[in-house]
Design a protein with these regions (language model features):
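Proteins synthesized as precursors that undergo proteolytic processing into mature forms
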Residues: 152-154, 163-170
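Peptidoglycan-targeting cell-wall enzymes and recognition modules
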Residues: 10-31, 38, 62-160
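Active-site-adjacent structural elements in enzyme catalytic domains
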Residues: 51-65
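Acidic helix/loop microenvironments that form the catalytic cleft of cell-wall polysaccharide enzymes
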Residues: 61-64, 170-182
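Short, mixed-charge amphipathic alpha-helical segments
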Residues: 44-49, 139-148, 170-173
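Non-transmembrane alpha-helical segments in soluble domains
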Residues: 40, 58, 157-158, 179
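N-terminal carbohydrate-binding/catalytic regions of secreted carbohydrate-active enzymes
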Residues: 22-55, 182
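Short, Lys/Arg-enriched N-terminal segments with co-localized hydrophobic residues
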Residues: 1-10
Length: 182
């Protein structure tokens, strides 16, 4: 198949725009269009390539992204101090700040490494690991924001899915185990 946007040959799509529109019924067409190619690339790259795997992955993406409405954590904007740290008692600070299970060991990590991407990559440790996989710095400056851009938002979801071996749970049609791991 020739991709008309890039004029390059690529594999047949694993999911069509019409299928996405059925699942993401409330999604704007511009968001379907924006995520369509990166989504098919991630499905192929991360071997999310059987009907059960695709169904489970797409269902999780639909839930976590609000049907492509959100590619970043949607809690209300926190009040930040002069160092960019969520103020004590804010929802960001209470939920993520100092969460060593997520690798949030520096002041401000809770807000800085909040969920981004279509399944909400969260925590310094996940940003570091995903960045190492890409051979790209995702932790300095404004670089964490890159994970909210369409290509990385989808790829981060595929990477997270793959590194948690979620295909094996999808193959068993085990939605509860998948959901717990996401």
């Amino acid at each position: 198949k020739i991709d008309s946007a890039t004029n390059e040959k690529r594999m047949a799509d694993l999911i069509s725009k019409d299928q996405l529109k059925l699942v993401f019924a409330t999604a704007k067409q511009e968001n379907i269009d924006k995520y369509f190619a990166p989504l098919n690339a991630a499905l192929a790259h991360y071997s999310i390539n059987s009907p059960l795997r695709i169904c489970h992955f797409i269902a999780q993406v639909a839930q976590e992204s609000g049907c492509f409405r959100y590619n970043e954590e949607i809690w209300p904007n926190p009040t930040l101090d002069a160092n960019g740290v969520a103020t004590k008692g804010s929802s960001w600070q209470l939920r993520y700040e100092g969460n060593t299970g997520l690798g949030n060991t520096h002041s401000g990590d809770g807000y800085r490494f909040r969920g981004r991407g279509l399944i909400q990559l969260t925590g310094r440790a996940n940003y570091e690991k995903y960045g190492a996989y890409l051979k790209r710095d995702l932790t300095s400056g404004t670089n964490p924001d890159l994970v909210a851009q369409p290509d990385l938002a989808v790829d981060a979801a595929g990477w997270y899915w793959s590194t948690r071996d979620l295909n094996s749970y999808a193959d068993k049609d085990d939605v509860l185990s998948i959901t717990k791991r996401i």
